[in-house]
Swiss-Prot record:
Superkingdom: Bacteria
Keywords, comma-separated and alphabetical: Periplasm, Signal
A GO cellular component entry from the record: periplasmic space
Assigned protein family: Belongs to the TolB family.
Entry annotated with the keyword Signal: yes
UniProt xrefs under Pfam families: PD40 (PF07676)
InterPro entries registered for this protein in UniProt: 6-blade_b-propeller_TolB-like, PD40
Major localization class: periplasm
Protein name: Protein TolB homolog
Organism encoding this protein: Chlamydia pneumoniae (Chlamydophila pneumoniae)
Annotated compartments: Periplasm
Residues annotated as signal peptide: 1-20
Length: 431
């Protein structure tokens, strides 16, 4: 039974290994970062408070460097450099102040610290993202949450179990979401709502069904009365459409369903394609909800297709002929790129398709199979999982530097990451 479940879920991720192509493209680019000095000061002489402020400042520096736009350096005191940030603590109020040559210091944000590092870490992430946007016009990405499936096979378990967890980009603030004692997979942030809702698939009723949970209410609610297996949900906030795959008619087909996050499905689901278009999977909306990218093996090999949905669903078109064994497409938040996986020289790599130019390129090159790329809000960074059938870890990769960093979490298989729950950044750009 476990093999059958795995086949259903991982079809588009693993089937493409059979058709490996001799393709390899390495892209290199130069980028320029903006130097900025970061210092901290406090009016207290308590050494514990001073040490704690230093810890927060260190986190802040890592956060603003994450976006690959700013190059922070720690300074022991406020300097006269052209651009600097000062973290000023008047217990319990911490202010983040912008210092520029010949200009009046500007407080970009301030908040109350609790001296609970887990709580204050999130506040620092939010402050760093505020500064990042103010200085660059590009959203900061340190305050987002990564939701993923963490699974293990215990000695007394016949079937693999997996719960959903969340973590920060650096592996900190790791916390469980579900406690269903079942297999929960493919979580996806919805992208709207102050309680940060997410969709996922759970096997707790025996067959996979789609559920809706949130950071405030982790007890998921089944969202569709549709019969059969339901997989790979994704949501368009703009169009209030839920896309998913179901085998209601025997074949794994692509469906769309008008859906309200508060009241549930509106009307009946619509089957977009039938068995003549092969097995379909991995749907992903563009930001406007007017188009859908997905995978189909109608030509024998899993390939990427795009379907326009406005004003009515139209015939899908093949996205790229270069990569014939593809899976896991993910449309970027800016609508300009699609990340996907493809087998290259026997290894599943992450590739990027540029919609404006029609060009695509290979992003990763390491000899480990990758899957499930998910975009940060800046459309310049991805989280993905990499490993094999028995083990898998989470990684971040920058499209700017092409560098990859492992998220150190601990034991267990980490799969299906989704990067989201980014707080709003209302501040205007300063520079």
């Amino acid at each position: 039974m476990l093999r059958q479940l795995c086949f259903q879920v991982f079809f588009f991720c693993f089937a493409s290994l059979v058709y490996a192509e001799e393709l390899e493209v390495v892209v290199r680019s130069e980028h320029i970062t903006l130097p900025i000095e970061v210092s901290c000061q406090t009016d207290t002489k308590d050494p514990k408070i001073q040490k704690y402020l230093s810890s927060l400042t260190e986190i802040f520096c890592k956060d603003i460097a994450l976006g690959d736009c700013l190059q922070p350096t720690a300074a022991s005191k406020e300097s006269s450099s052209p651009l600097a940030i000062s973290l000023r603590l008047h217990v319990p109020q911490l202010s983040v102040v912008l210092l520029q040559s010949s200009k009046t210091p500007q407080t970009l944000c301030s908040f109350t610290i609790s001296q609970n590092l887990s709580v204050d870490r999130q506040k620092i992430h939010h402050a760093a993202d505020t500064v990042h946007y103010a200085l660059t016009g590009i959203p900061g990405i340190s305050a987002g949450k990564i939701v993923f499936a963490l699974s293990s096979l215990g000695k007394d378990q016949k079937l693999k179990q997996g719960e959903l967890w969340t973590t920060d980009y650096d592996g900190k603030n790791l916390a469980p979401l579900t406690t269903e004692c079942s297999l929960s997979i493919t979580p996806k942030w919805v992208g709207v709502g102050s309680n940060f809702p997410y969709l996922y698939v759970s096997y707790k009723y025996g067959v996979p069904k789609i559920f809706l949970g949130s950071l405030e209410n982790t007890e998921g609610k089944k969202v569709l009365p549709l019969k059969g297996n339901q997989l790979m949900p994704t949501f368009s906030p703009r169009k209030k459409l839920l896309a998913f795959v179901a085998d209601t008619y025997g074949n794994p087909d692509l469906f769309i369903q008008p859906f309200s996050l508060t009241s549930g499905p509106m009307g009946r689901p619509r089957r977009l394609l039938n068995e003549n278009f092969g097995t379909q999977g991995n749907p992903s909306f563009n930001p406007e909800g007017s188009q859908l990218v997905f995978i189909s093996n109608k030509d024998g090999r899993p390939r990427l297709y795009i379907m326009s949905l406005d004003p009515e669903p139209q015939a899908p078109r093949l996205l790229t002929k270069k990569y014939r064994n593809s899976s896991c497409p993910a449309w970027s938040p800016d609508g300009k790129k699609i990340a996907f996986c493809s087998v290259i020289k026997g290894v599943r790599q992450i590739c990027i398709y540029d919609l404006s130019s029609g060009e695509d390129y290979q992003l990763t090159t390491s000899p480990t199979n990758k899957e499930s790329p998910s975009w940060a809000i800046d459309s310049r960074h991805l989280v993905f999982s990499a490993g094999n059938a028995e083990e898998s870890e989470l990684y971040l990769i920058s499209l700017v530097t092409k560098k990859t960093n492992k998220i150190a979490i601990g034991v267990g298989e980490k799969r299906f990451p989704s990067w989201g729950a980014f707080p709003q950044q209302p501040i205007k750009r300063t520079l």
